[in-house]
Amino acid sequence: MKVSKDKSKKGVKSKPKTSRKPLSLKQKLQRESKIVKVDNLNWKAVDIPDNLDDYQGFYGLEEIDGVDVKVTGGNVEFVVKDNSKVKDSDNEEDDDDVHDDDDNQDDGDDDQDDDDVDIEDDEDEIIEGDNEDDFKGFDDDNAINEDDQMDIESAKTEKKSKKEVKPKNEKVAKKDSILESAFKNVDLTLPDDNEVNLPYWDDLSLSSFTLNGLSALEYEKPTAIQKRTIPLAIEGKDVIGKAITGSGKTLAYGIPILERHLQKMAKANQSKKVINPPTGIIFAPTRELAHQVVDHLNRIAKFTPLSQHGIVSITGGLSIQKQERLLSHGPGIVVATPGRFLELLQKDMALVQRLSCTDIVVLDEADRLLQDGHFDEFVKILELFGKHRPRDNKELEWKWQTLVFSATFSRDLFGKLDKHLKSNKNKEEMGSSLIDNDEILQLLNDKLKFKDSKPTLVDANPKEMVAGQITEALVECGPTERDLYLYYFLLLYPGSTLVFANSIDSVKRLAPFLNNLKVPTFSIHSSMIQKQRLRTLERFKEASSKNSTAVLIASDVAARGLDIPNIDHVAHYHLPRSADVYIHRSGRTGRAGKEGVSIMFCSPQESSGPLRKLRKLVANNTKKRTRLNVHNDVKLLPLEMDLVSQIKPRVTLASKLADAERSSSSTRKEDNWVHEAAEELGIDNLSDIDNFEDDFIKRQRKRKENKALTKDEARSLRLELNDLLSKQIRKNSRRSYLTSGLQNLAHQMVTGNTHKDVLGHASVNALDDLRTKKAIKKKQIKTKKVKDKK
C-alpha cells in the first residue's frame, strides 16, 4: 500500500494491523472530553442591572455553560468537550494527558506491541480528520506537505491570539468596575466643619467625621441614654444601659465604636498587608435588627474614610461564602447574629484568633440572656474569644470592653402571663430600676464576665416601661370577634399599622383576610426565608409612604429592635405571652419623640388573668402598680355599634374566603407530604391509609375539609363581597334624607369635610379619640403658642 511506503520513507517500520474492537459511545465521549480544574475554566462575568438595589450576594458573579460536573469519590470534577470553555494557557498542557488516559482505557486488554500499533493508527486517523474539510479526492500521496503544515500552525496561532484578547479585555473591565466602586465617594462633597452647628453634642468631644454625619441626619440633640453612655464608652468602661424603646440605643454604642475605629485608622500603618481585627463586634437577636444596625451605622459613617466593607453584617439566611469573603477584607465593625457567627468561627480557627483581638463587644437586646435556653451560641463565642485572645500583645488589653443595652432588664417580665402571679412586696418596692436590681446584675456578670469588676449602670428611664408618648388602649371583644374589631379599627383610623399575632398560622390567615377587604396588607414571620422578609419590609415601607393605609401582619420576629419609620398604630391581635414581648411590640410606634397608639384586642378570659398581670408589671407609675382595676391606666377605644353592624357582613364573607384558602393550601401540603413519603417507602396503594390515622388527625382533617369551598362557591362569595365593598358605609344609616338630622351630610360631601370610607363621619385620629378633654386643651394651647411665636 502507499501508506506503508510513506511510512517507510519516514523511517517507520510497518506492522501488520491487528483486529481492533469498535469504540463504545462512552469511550468516544471520553476521547472528546477532558477534565479541567475550576480555576482553568473560561468564566464570564455577569453584568448586574443598575436598578437592582439589594445585591444579596451577587457581587463578582461569574457564569459558564457547556461544562459537565462529575463527582467521583467525593471530589468534584469539571468535564469539558469544547476547548473554548478552557483558558488558552491550559489547553496544550491537558491534551496529552487526556489522550493518554483514553488510549489506556480503550486498549487495556491488548498486548504492549498491539498498543503501539493502535496509537500509530490513531495518529493517522487524527491527521485524516483534520484534513476532512480540504479533501478533494484520492491523491497518490497522503502525507502532509510542509506548506500545509505551516498553514495549519499559522491558523492555530491566529485563533490563540483572538482568544487571548478576550480575557484581557474582561480583566480590564473588571479592574475598571473595582476602581469605580472603590473611589465612588471621592467626589463626595464634605460639609465644612465650621458650618456644623451642633452645640448639644460639643460636650461629648466627637470627631468632625461623626459630627458631619449627625448634622446630615439632623440629629441636633443627643437623647438621655446617648448623653450618659457615650462618654463612658469612649473612656473604655464597661456599660450596662437601659432605656425605653425608640430612644436611640443604636447610636449610644455605635458612636463610641466608630470613634475608636477612626483613632485606630489614624495610627495604623497602611503599608502592612495584614488583615486587622475589627474594632467592634455587635450581636443582635434577629437578622432584621442586624441589617438595620448596619444601615444606621453606614448613614452615620457617611463622611468617614471607611472602606466599602468597613461595616458588614453576618446573619443567617444569606450566602455563607460571601460572608467569609467580607470578613477576609478586615472590616472595622461587624454586626452579627450569634448562630451564623459561631458557624463561621467553628470552620476557621485563624478567624477565631483574629476576631478575638477585637476591642469592643456589644450585646443589643441583652434581656434575652436572662431567659433560659436563649443565646447559648453567644456564650460559646465568648468562650472561644477568651481562649484564643493573645496575652503577650502589649498593644492589646487582656479583656475586651463590653457594652450591654436593652429596654427591659427585669426577670419578672419574662414569666408567662397565664400563670399565677406571686406577689412579692420587696420586688414591688424595688420597682423596675436597673440600679436596684442586684439579681440581674449578677446574672449578666456571670455570663458576660466584664473587664471591670463593677460595670457602670445607666438607667435612662427608671420608672418607665412603655414610652410616655405611646397611648395604650383596649378593645374588649369575644374570641371570634377579633377580625371584626380589627377591621373596624383599620377602617375608621387610617395610617400605617403593625399587627402582631402569637402564631404563624394566624399571620398566614390574617393577610388574605384583610386583602379580601381591599386593605393593603403584608406579612412577615420566622418561617419565611431572609430575602422574603427583607423584601416584605421594603414593600411595606413603600406602601405606607404612598397609601393612607398600610398593614403589616407579623409574628414576634418583628417585635424587637426594628425601626420601621412612621408606624402610627400597633395592634395586638392576641395578648402577648409575656410582658417583655408587649413592651417591645409597643415600642415599634412612638419612636424618636413621635406619638403612637398601642391597642389590645382582649377576650373576657384574657382580661380576668393575663391582662391584669400585664398591667401590674408594665404600668408606668410604680406607686400605682398594685391597683386591681385595669381600666384606670388603659383607655377603652370608643366603639360606634352602628358602623360595626354595617361592616359585619363584609367581615363574615372575607373570613370564609380566607379560611377556605388557608385550609385548601394546608391539606394540599399534607397530601403532597404523604405521597412523597409513600413513594420513598415504595407503597403504591394509599387507600388503606385512613385506617392508620389518629382520631385527632381525622377530626382536624374533617374540620379543614368543612371550611374548604368549591371554585363556584368561592367565586360567588367573592362577587358578593365585592358588591358590599362597592357600597359606602354611612353613619346613622337609618336617616332617610341626606339633609335631615343635626349633621348635614350633603354639605359635608360638598365641602370634603368627611371620612374617606365612612359617609357622614368626620375624619378622626385614634390619638384624639383616646385623649381626655384636659389633654386636648393642653395640645390646643401648645399649638396656639407655636403659632403666636411664628
Curated annotation (Swiss-Prot):
Superkingdom of source: Eukaryota
Feature: compositional bias, Acidic residues: 90-133, 140-149
Enzyme Commission code: 3.6.4.13
Subcellular location: Nucleus, Nucleolus
Motif position, Q motif: 199-227
A GO cellular component annotation in the UniProt record: cytosol
Domain Helicase C-terminal: start-end pairs: 483-642
Residues covered by region (Disordered): 1-29, 80-149
Swiss-Prot/TrEMBL keywords: ATP-binding, Helicase, Hydrolase, Nucleotide-binding, Nucleus, Ribosome biogenesis, RNA-binding, rRNA processing
Main localization category: nucleus
Keyword Phosphoprotein: no
Residue span(s) of domain Helicase ATP-binding: 230-427
Residue span of motif DEAD box: 364-367
InterPro entries noted in UniProt: DEAD/DEAH_box_helicase_dom, DEAD_box_RNA_helicase, Helicase_ATP-bd, Helicase_C-like, P-loop_NTPase, RNA-helicase_DEAD-box_CS, RNA_helicase_DEAD_Q_motif
Keyword hit for Hydrolase: yes
Annotated catalysed reactions: ATP + H2O = ADP + phosphate + H(+)
Basic and acidic residues composition bias: residue spans: 80-89
SUPFAM superfamilies with a match to the protein in the record: P-loop containing nucleoside triphosphate hydrolases (SSF52540)
GO biological process, alphabetically ordered: rRNA processing
GO molecular function, one term: RNA helicase activity
Free-text comment on this protein's domains from its UniProt entry: The Q motif is unique to and characteristic of the DEAD box family of RNA helicases and controls ATP binding and hydrolysis.
Name of this chain's protein: ATP-dependent RNA helicase MAK5
Encoding gene (name): MAK5
